[in-house]
Regions:
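Short, charged N-terminal beta->alpha structural module
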Residues: 1-46
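Residues that cap or initiate secondary-structure elements
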Residues: 24-25, 110-112, 198-200, 260
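Short amphipathic alpha-helical segments
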Residues: 31, 68-71, 218
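Bergerat-fold GHKL ATPase/HATPase_c domain
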Residues: 50-141, 152, 156-169, 173-177
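Conserved beta-strand-loop-beta-strand hairpin that lines the nucleotide-binding pocket
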Residues: 95-101, 152-265
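Short, conserved beta-strand edge motifs with alternating hydrophobic and charged residues
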Residues: 140-143, 205
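Conserved polar catalytic motif of the HATPase_c/GHKL fold
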Residues: 145, 149
Length: 265
């Protein structure tokens, strides 16, 4: 099956954003930045980010330290640099940061080798001053389910039912190794976007580059009494204020109540 990419970024989509990081000279970084609507890239952040300085996105190899650093101000997120540079970055990444949110774009391989959910959950709690408690815990559980679905069922296209039995789980592990050895599937991106849209709530969107799925049909299927496998969408639906799918089922958008630690004290 051919790869279905996240929507391409439109030219000049987000002026006022700058990419920071060491880039491969084999491709024209600044031309790719311009195509994304980014200011010319820089190898390091400005010494003194004033009011006129653009919002910063960190780019480079996906390591725990670079991702953690990218989720800490002055940065607004991380874009993993692939073999083709910035090609394939989804439009939602740029739009989210432009709107004041936080974003990440990683390949499936990298997403399987770093504690992605933990890194994102910590950053969300810190950036939104999210109060600890049940809501924060449910958010992290939903994030874990959505990320797992995006990687396994979306980008790697591994069926739900394989993990339903011990024998099936052995097959699942073998198939996963094979899919991650496939350069096309392994390079598909998972993208995570966090945005406080209105007082009292924030959205968490997880995008993949797989074939997509029918959210309503999948929720109905998992609700059956004899269902033995699924994507955990019933749990997500119960934990979220709202749940929607976009981009032909390749993006899951979850809305959560937002109570800051200050408000809850």
């Amino acid at each position: 099956m051919t790869s279905t990419a996240c929507p391409d970024v439109k030219p000049n989509a987000a002026p006022g954003l700058r990419l920071v990081g060491s880039m491969n000279r084999m491709w024209d970084v600044d031309r790719q930045c311009a195509a994304l609507g980014l200011a010319p890239h820089s190898t390091s952040p400005p010494d003194d980010a004033g009011a006129e300085e653009p919002t910063l996105l960190l780019a480079g190899p996906a390591t725990i330290e670079t991702i953690r650093h990218s989720l800490t101000p002055p940065y607004a997120g991380f874009l993993e640099i692939g073999s083709d540079g910035l090609t394939g970055i989804g439009q939602r990444c740029i739009e989210t940061v432009r709107a004041g949110g936080m974003t990440l774009s990683l390949t499936a391989t990298s997403a399987c080798t770093v504690p992605l959910v933990e890194l994102i959950a910590v950053a969300i709690r810190r950036r939104l001053a999210l109060a600890t408690g049940e809501n924060a815990e449910l958010m992290e559980i939903c994030l874990a389910e959505a990320v797992s679905n995006a990687i396994i069922h979306g980008n790697l296209e591994i069926p739900n039912h394989l993990r339903a039995t011990p024998k099936g789980f052995d097959t699942f592990r073998q198939v996963m190794r094979e899919r991650l050895s496939d350069p096309v599937m392994a390079s598909r991106r998972i993208e995570i976007h966090v945005l406080a849209r209105q007082p009292g709530s924030f959205t968490l969107a997880v995008s993949d580059q797989g074939p997509g799925f029918d959210l309503a049909a999948q929720i109905k299927k998992e609700a059956r009494a004899d269902a033995r496998s699924g994507r955990g969408l019933g749990l997500i639906r119960r934990a979220c204020a709202t749940i929607e799918s976009e981009d032909g089922g390749r993006t899951l958008v979850m809305t959560f109540p937002w109570e800051s630690a200050t408000e809850g004290s």
